[in-house]
Every structure is written in C-alpha cells, then in structure tokens.
Amino acid sequence: MESFAIKTFGKKNVEVYDARKGYKKCDILISKGVGHNRSASALSLSAAHSKHHKLSGSKSIIFNKPIKVVEKMNKSFIFFIIDGKRIYFPDEKMNSDRWSSVGAKIEPWRKGGQHILYCAQNGRPPFFHINEELPYFQWQENFLKELSGVAKCDIVYRPHPRGRLSNKKIQSFLPSMGNVTISTNDNLYDDFLDAKCIITYNSTCSVNSIIKGIPTFVIDKDYITRGLARNGLKFIEKPLTLKRSGWLNSFGYCQWSEEEVVNGIFWRYAKKHIF
C-alpha cells in the first residue's frame, strides 16, 4: 500500500501517518482494513480511520481482505469513499475480462428453500458502521423482532464468525422468538444449502449468496450488491432475481493483485473511472 502511494504520487507528496494521532488534512486518504485482527490497537486504528474519512472530506482508497468468491483469491478488495459515500465501482458498463479470469461458477437463481438465513454483523466497534440512532445490540434486537413478525417461514440466525461478544448477547433473546433457530455451522456454504433467501446488514457474504443464486436482502443503504439485492424487508416475499452478468463484470474491478496495484494498472483504472 505504501509502495503504491509513493510510486503513484511521488515520495515528497506522501506522508505515512498514524490516524490515532488525530485528524490531518489530505487530498487522498489511503488506509487498510484491519481484517481479522481484533487487538485493541487494530480496533482503535480502524476507528480512527473511519473518523478521519468523515472529517477530511477527501477522496479515500480503502484496501481490505479479498472477498473470496473462489478458494484461492490473492487480491485486495479495494473500494473508495467520495463525498462521504462508498463507491465500489463505476456506474458505466465494464468489460468482462477481469470477472471471467476469476473462474467462479455462477449458479441459477434458486426458486425453493426451507428458511430465511440471517447473517449477522460483527457488533464490536468499529466493524459495525451504521447511522442508526440506537446502539448496535438494541438495533439488532428490534430488527430481528421485525423480521420474525413478517417472515412466513423459519429463520436461521448465523452468528458472525468474529463477533463473540455481540453473538453471546444477541443469542440470549433469540429463544423468545419461536421461529428463529441458531446455526452451529462453521462453513457459510453449509448454511446456504436450504436457504430460500439471505438477509444481512452489509456483509460481503451477500456477494457469495448472489453468485450462488440465492435471493438476497441487504439492510444498509450503501451496499455493494445494489441492483441485485433488495434493500430492507418491505418486499421480503418478492426477491430480485435479475440478470447478474453486468454487475459481476463491474465487481471484477473491485479486487486487485499486489502486482496490479504497484505497477499502476489499478491507479489508471481508478483515475479514469472513479476520480
């Protein structure tokens, strides 16, 4: 990431800065997600990055762990924040070459299924970035009660694999909902097997469910699967099953290898289509 910045913008124009020291004005903010690291240092750094994005008003480039649509994915998932809004890829039609090279199998849209699968977020700050007025746990309880009330079939609650504290607290009230059970599967795809649809806040698992052909609902309004997944629960009985090729072609431009980042291919794309 640092080598990309220096090679792209020149050493004299780049400052490596610890955002925990406080806000510092910049033209382009480049940061890296903390991934699976749950240490206090990593969490405070990620929270500082989020605050910096909001205060700076600058264009931001965010490097994250890949969204694994195939088993071997040695690339970074990169998105942008511009004017306070997350940008995953441009609105224009994109070439199919990058997505085709991934080699992921696209499954037909599912027409059946036994239950609704709800994939929970990691409630520990700063992983849960929402603009809701309520604290995460209260928001989550209210949402699950709403979902339980409108669902016409059973609901399977999949705990977030890295949300130990939030999972324990939320699961304490789930037994009071007669149509909700808790998954014990480690593998996400095991929970996909009998699901008629997937619901998540803004987890990247919505990408995997779209590829697997499972109708998907996302609660966040700034989500990557916009256009293929419905937002909210209003049309829970009318999921989208649209053509996916255009969206997948665009998604191919979200993940970049280290070589592509360092040698300028990624920046030429970003400069032309994003900035």
Predicted regions, residues:
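Leloir-type glycosyltransferase catalytic cores
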Residues: 74-114, 227-275
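Phosphate/adenylate-binding glycine loop and adjacent helical scaffold
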Residues: 42-44, 66-77
